[in-house]
């Protein structure tokens, strides 16, 4: 899974690890198109994406800001060059699902509030999609 470490220039959650990108659509913009636009603006690439779930998230931040949002989660596949926007992102990393899960349990303070809330459902979706295929074809757990 592709993760980004948010730039310290962000108005909240700077330096924390999170999903590949986040966005708010502009008035009249389709949600999927907004997500693809921001993926390109933040991570420097475009790929086909599909919605997998949505959730309501609420968090209060150290700077006094409170977010209360209805978030949509999309997924896609990409194995090309990542040329991230340094105003948005300070680093990126590809991680296995178990690595993320273990890190979230050991060091939750390294992750954004919304990613902590979304990850269990992302992991559930991932297992349903990939576990039956990989365990039958290779006999190995792709999450280890």
PLM segments and residue spans:
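Nudix hydrolase/Nudix homology domain
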Residues: 15, 27, 56-61, 65-144
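A short coil-to-beta-strand element that immediately follows conserved catalytic motifs
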Residues: 45-55
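Conserved Nudix-box catalytic region and its N-terminal flanking loop in Nudix hydrolases
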Residues: 1-41
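Structural signal for conserved beta-strand scaffold positions within catalytic alpha/beta enzyme cores
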Residues: 3, 51-53, 94
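Secondary-structure boundary elements
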Residues: 44-46, 81-82
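A structural signal for short, well-ordered beta-strand segments
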Residues: 21, 51, 72-74
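N-proximal short alpha-helices
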Residues: 4-8, 12, 47, 65, ...
